[in-house]
């Protein structure tokens, strides 16, 4: 049954940090299928950005993918788990569970329960160990520890620690890179992931926009992009320990500069950036065979996304290199570039921890600026593309406790640690932490359909801050860099007046519910029609930015476009539409023909956003209030 399968999958991820015994990995005893894995030592920090780690992970998930049936997959995975690096094993096993047909409907347990040490600072984990060791042997009562602050106000960036260190955001980033591994080889799997390069651009662009909104909410200036490969970088201390080895994710002192590694020189990265920018301005990229591939409006962003990341779909890996991934690796090794001190890398090396570091956002704004440079070569959308004839949006209301105001507060949350680390025999070991949460709300959009027939519309909802850090109104073309997508959905409009109502919990960017390890072991919420994309998505408690105490003003932007022109064949039957805007849809095309981020993905030549509007758009000013 599905439940039995789910239990077997859960057991693969239980107590992973102590699954391998260092020095016990005599590979000769293992199945011949596993001969290409076991290079990365158990206890080392696995990096989803380092080419060597990624290649070994690819070998392993291809072995899992090739397993004859579900039973064979579980058995070979159980064997690999005994000697393969635990982070690499989790990555490969998750990719396999997410993509094997006989695993449809199964969930991977939440990464924050598999590796709580990547999410919960070491002081709290240490406290849990201590509490477990000083109690009588027969005592099984639950243990609760509190997560302590990891910094203080001497560091201006500390004001955003609540956001960067949010468990849900970091788990989303880990999961997104499993659904879209950079080593995914469409020729080998016989499945192309639709618009994967463009999704890489869009998902990270939205992360940057959301981070800037959060900075403005805290009275800080929007971030400055990383810009110059020779500049000293700001420091960061993660306070995380890697339980599998007992070593910590290295902090980065203030003022270090990027330095050459054995694998890559900084001058090579400068050259990669130059070559990509040259190609953008020439309007084409050079393929491996020397032919030119035009960066047209339809595929340009997708081609660039594969180049910049870079993934297996890069048109010319030798020439354009691997800019984004090497940036993560060099920043993570900045404190010990040649390995002379045997230091562990910093958090930038790992997708489940890199969002904690402020430098992540500076780096990604730098990457986003490359795409921005390309988007600026495209013509602004003209009236005919933006307009939806006969459709007029007359008003928009955001319904909450107070109309057009969203209230935020801090909420207490507990994370179960016992499946990842369990010293002793406690029934449960939980870490208590606080995260932001906003009240649920809904949108009511009043639309007039002036035609005589029913129309199908795509409703696109965005939010953007009204004022910049100095209190000036943000101009339209600048605004599009901080516009965040809140929702996108299909609706039917009858002739005459229509009111379209949509709840915030149904958003196309957020994850509505993630079952815990315990839920999965007990078979809660299992359904054969669910797909892997159901566990990818932005955390719903951070759908909107936090605002401030007096109520920060935002533009709520609503646009209706013609669904008959937007629809993609076959996208009606997508089993999981949870976070389709950021995560796409399994084995289907991305269910929207328009470019991701439309209409804010191209230059806007009007000064005020109000001059940009056509009849099918509407802007309502709303407030977001934060209560201590």
Swiss-Prot record:
Tissue and organ expression note: Hemolymph.
UniProt keyword annotations, A-Z: Copper, Disulfide bond, Glycoprotein, Metal-binding, Oxygen transport, Secreted, Transport
Disulfide linkage: 534-576, 536-583
Family: Belongs to the tyrosinase family. Hemocyanin subfamily.
Binding site for Cu cation 1: 173, 177, 204
Residues with Blocked amino end (Thr) modification: 1
GO annotation, biological process: oxygen transport
Protein known as: Hemocyanin II
Keyword flag Phosphoprotein: no
